[in-house]
Amino acid sequence: MNIAKLIDHTILKPNSTKEDVMKVIEEAKQYKFASVCINPTWVKLAAEELAGHDVDVCTVIGFPLGASTTETKAFETKDAIAKGATEVDMVINVGALKDGDNEFVEKDIYEVVQAAKGKALVKVIIETCLLTDEEKVRACELSVKAGADFVKTSTGFSTGGATAEDIALMRKTVGPNVGVKASGGVRTREDADKMVEAGASRVGASASVAIVLNDAKGATDNY
């Protein structure tokens, strides 16, 4: 298995400098990761640097809390795509999901899907560590209904990250035709393999190089 092609090589720390981001971009070129996942401010740079390389430009929307308005998320999506993003990872409105406001949650996702239609993949971060199993299932069902391409476990900025159990539950819920992304706490090749075995079709990690080289010593998970 070519694990590199399943990895979104991630740098989302708020204090990331241009030098930090360029390092991630160069590593993505070298190891041929599926994408670089960066904050929106770096999308234009990444798109320019990765032109001609088989590496997608992924960014985050409504990140990390998911509590911005639907209109803001849709605008962020259009703006990111205009600057060169080919994948967007949006955060659901977790509070609305917990309130049982399915209509709001679905519309929130749907508007981002529409803003990205035909131009970028949409991954929906459900923030599993804050949800009950019933809420995880509902979040996945609403994501599929809204037309998302992927569901994703975590931002990496909350109380926990991906678990194999959550990946299995999400895969069971969305079926074979929607992607499942494991992110948060995936630091080693063993971690990544466990997620893929449980049903993940993509892995988000900042320790991507260590995962590919199978080097536990080099692994950190500082998004």
UniProtKB/Swiss-Prot annotation:
Transmembrane segments: none annotated. Its EC number is 4.1.2.4. It is found in: Cytoplasm. It holds the Pfam family DeoC. GO terms for cellular component: cytoplasm. Keywords: Cytoplasm, Lyase, Schiff base. It catalyses: 2-deoxy-D-ribose 5-phosphate = D-glyceraldehyde 3-phosphate + acetaldehyde. GO terms for biological process: 2-deoxyribose 1-phosphate catabolic process; carbohydrate catabolic process; deoxyribonucleotide catabolic process. The keyword Lyase applies. Pathway: Carbohydrate degradation; 2-deoxy-D-ribose 1-phosphate degradation; D-glyceraldehyde 3-phosphate and acetaldehyde from 2-deoxy-alpha-D-ribose 1-phosphate: step 2/2. InterPro entries: Aldolase_TIM, DeoC, DeoC/FbaB/LacD_aldolase, DeoC_typeI. The active site is at residues 89, 152, 181. GO terms for molecular function: deoxyribose-phosphate aldolase activity. It is an enzyme of class 4 (lyase). PANTHER family: DEOXYRIBOSE-PHOSPHATE ALDOLASE. Catalyzes a reversible aldol reaction between acetaldehyde and D-glyceraldehyde 3-phosphate to generate 2-deoxy-D-ribose 5-phosphate. Belongs to the DeoC/FbaB aldolase family. DeoC type 1 subfamily. This is Deoxyribose-phosphate aldolase. It comes from Bacillus mycoides (strain KBAB4) (Bacillus weihenstephanensis).
